Amino acid sequence: MNNTEFYDRLGVSKDASQDEIKKAYRKMSKKYHPDINKEPGAEQKYKDVQEAYETLSDAQKRSAYDQYGAAGAQGGFGGGGFGGFDGGGFGGFEDIFSSFFGGGGGMRNPNAPRQGDDLQYRVNLTFEEAIFGVEKDVSYHREATCHTCAGSGAKPGTSPVTCGRCHGSGVINVDTQTPLGMMRRQVTCDVCHGSGKEIKEPCQTCHGTGHEKETHKVSVKIPAGVETGQQIRLQGQGEAGFNGGPYGDLFVVLNVLPSQKFERNGSTIYYNLNISFVQAALGDTVDIPTVHGDVEMAIPAGTQTGKVFRLKGKGAPKLRGAGQGDQHVTVNIVTPTKLNEKQKEALRAFAEASGQEISTPKKKGFFDKMKDALEDI
């Protein structure tokens, strides 16, 4: 067996995170569960998935598997000659390897309540919704407790029974001959598939899983002043738990759409204002749009391009403090590209009054243009 087979069984890459491995396991486990999939070979594939997950979900087992393959994950790597060694107070090499590779009292009780998986849902907000806050209804698919069997997986009127093979532990002991001698390891029970229970008569709605798909709707209150990437946690709105465990949580990830007028950094809002050179030279009073409505702003005479004015309290709310941010207005002086004769005369008079000499560029004739063209060749 190569060192990627377990990853291939779950359909994940070798550098997959534990969350990705867990999700892949749940998907493959449901796909090949013997109570659901009656196709030939499904049960063996289910066992293969269980074996792969048992190793890859444990950090120490996974590390050993990545280095030595399946033998490493089972404790069967290294030199020989120690088969009959008794380590006194350590309980022997079998117990030492058992503590590292899945044996003994470290096994999780399969019948213990477990919380369901968390979910993520991405919500788009307009620029203004992020500033002022909003309440949104979101709808998504999730695994819910089966309404027919109340999560037991058994047909109404019946109950799951303790597994006769593993006696409810969910695991069985398997002896394996290794270079270190006979090693005992614990593996998932091949009868109850780790649940510790047998369902003689599965529920017809959920086919024994205890869960069913549903479309769930919930209202999300989004506070004022949020930004892209922030999350809101809704407790108990994730997927159904196991063995009576609580639902997981829903994490709402916020994405603020850009504005055509404004930019934002934290509680500060930025706005670019275009003005004429006449307004810049003589000064003016203009209306400035803000998210709170238009406000008047005075432009002093002699204002230069790049000058920044601050409108106090016209920014976004501060999430972790009182009050509002500010709006910064950056001035950009626009030079006209077309002037009529009257405007040109006025500017020439201004230049003359300022002691400036303005040379009017000569228009090039036909021969000048030909000369320039030949020089470029």
Swiss-Prot record:
Cofactor notes: Binds 2 Zn(2+) ions per monomer.
Keyword Repeat tagged: yes
Entry binding sites for Zn(2+) 1: 146, 149, 203, 206
Cofactor(s), by name: Zn(2+)
Chief subcellular location: cytoplasm
Any one cellular-component term (Gene Ontology): cytoplasm
Any GO BP: protein refolding
Pfam family, one: DnaJ
Start-end of CR-type zinc fingers: 133-215
Compartment(s) where it occurs, according to its Swiss-Prot or TrEMBL record: Cytoplasm
Gene3D superfamilies listed in its UniProt record: DnaJ domain, Heat shock protein DnaJ, cysteine-rich domain, Urease metallochaperone UreE, N-terminal domain
Ranges for the CXXCXGXG motif repeats: 146-153, 163-170, 189-196, 203-210
Record-annotated J domain positions: 5-69
InterPro entries cross-referenced by the UniProt entry: DnaJ, DnaJ_C, DnaJ_domain, DnaJ_domain_CS, HSP40/DnaJ_pept-bd, HSP_DnaJ_Cys-rich_dom, HSP_DnaJ_Cys-rich_dom_sf, J_dom_sf
Key words of the record: Chaperone, Cytoplasm, DNA replication, Metal-binding, Repeat, Stress response, Zinc, Zinc-finger
Keyword Kinase annotated: no
MF terms in GO: ATP binding; heat shock protein binding; unfolded protein binding; zinc ion binding
SUPFAM superfamilies: Chaperone J-domain, DnaJ/Hsp40 cysteine-rich domain, HSP40/DnaJ peptide-binding domain
HAMAP family listed in its UniProt record: DnaJ (MF_01152)
UniProt domain comment: The J domain is necessary and sufficient to stimulate DnaK ATPase activity. Zinc center 1 plays an important role in the autonomous, DnaK-independent chaperone activity of DnaJ. Zinc center 2 is essential for interaction with DnaK and for DnaJ activity.
Entry-linked NCBIfam families: DnaJ_bact, PRK10767.1, PRK14276.1
Family: Belongs to the DnaJ family.
Assembly, per entry: Homodimer.
Function: Participates actively in the response to hyperosmotic and heat shock by preventing the aggregation of stress-denatured proteins and by disaggregating proteins, also in an autonomous, DnaK-independent fashion. Unfolded proteins bind initially to DnaJ; upon interaction with the DnaJ-bound protein, DnaK hydrolyzes its bound ATP, resulting in the formation of a stable complex. GrpE releases ADP from DnaK; ATP binding to DnaK triggers the release of the substrate protein, thus completing the reaction cycle.
Protein name: Chaperone protein DnaJ
Protein's organism: Streptococcus uberis (strain ATCC BAA-854 / 0140J)
Highest classification ranks of the organism: Bacteria, Bacillati, Bacillota, Bacilli, Lactobacillales
